[in-house]
Amino acid sequence: MGILEQLENPKFKATKSEKTLIEYIKSDLDNIIYKSISIIAKESGVGEATITRFTKKLGFNGFQDFKVTLAKEISNKKNTSIINLHVHRDESVTETANKMLKSSINILEQTVKQIDLDLMCKCRDLIMNAKRVYFIGIGYSGIAATDINYKFMRIGFTTVPVTDSHTMVIMSSITNDDDVIVAISNSGTTKEVIKTVKQAKENGTKIITLTEDSDNPLRKLSDYELTYTSAETIFETGSISSKIPQIFLLDLLYTEVIKEMFSEAVEKKIKTTSAILND
């Protein structure tokens, strides 16, 4: 029996809070799979723990597992593509492009609204005072880590991109309290990244995390947590909905650093550009 069938089944025994959650899910099926557990909890008025227990009651390992199955059901029911459940197989390129544009604008607007200005400044100062900065991430988050590492390196920072688990293990064993790790993971559940951060914290290394706004294990390990709302489903791993806020927040952090060290940053940028052109 599918999720939707279970929710409609009169024999399904639900608590008062679970009934509230069921009504919320049924009223927002088109968008529920794009929302984090924290957003659902806030909008439905039901606690995150209740949501987790409810999904396990339905036979799932947790909220993410629940969303995977629900996404499949909705996809099959609406005959839509699993690449993006708002994109239909038979629509024109223009329609798809406009949907993606609108989605990108909405994501950026949500990201800006969530920014904690004081926290961003603290992250900026932490990086500026660090001896070394490690940007770590696996998969698509690793791409974001590599991109921002290159930018900081161009203005004179000693930075290291770490995007594979083996190197992470080595790196985390030798970091110290002069170092900063910026750990990037959309879900905040990437095991390799979590393991690395735990080890580095034992060495006194300061941790900045960048994850979606959910009750995830990685952000709980951070000294400073930067979060964003991601509309990414399990089928959209690496989609624009997670990459846009990641890149935007990292670029904002980078820009804030440049503003503080403007003349020096410009000088270093000129030197590195010259070195590249003369290579």
From Swiss-Prot:
Residues 123-263 form the SIS domain. Residues 37-56 bind DNA. Residues 1-77 form the HTH rpiR-type domain. It holds the Pfam family HTH_6. The keyword Transcription applies. Keywords: DNA-binding, Transcription, Transcription regulation. GO terms for molecular function: carbohydrate derivative binding; DNA binding; DNA-binding transcription factor activity. The keyword Lipoprotein does not apply. GO terms for biological process: carbohydrate derivative metabolic process. It comes from the Bacteria. InterPro entries: Homeodomain-like_sf (IPR009057), HTH_RpiR (IPR000281), RpiR-like (IPR047640), RpiR-like_SIS (IPR035472), SIS_dom (IPR001347), SIS_dom_sf (IPR046348), WH-like_DNA-bd_sf (IPR036388). Gene3D superfamilies: Glucose-6-phosphate isomerase like protein, domain 1 (3.40.50.10490), Winged helix-like DNA-binding domain superfamily/Winged helix DNA-binding domain (1.10.10.10). PANTHER family: GLUCOKINASE, HTH-TYPE TRANSCRIPTIONAL REGULATOR HEXR-RELATED. This is Uncharacterized HTH-type transcriptional regulator CPE0189.
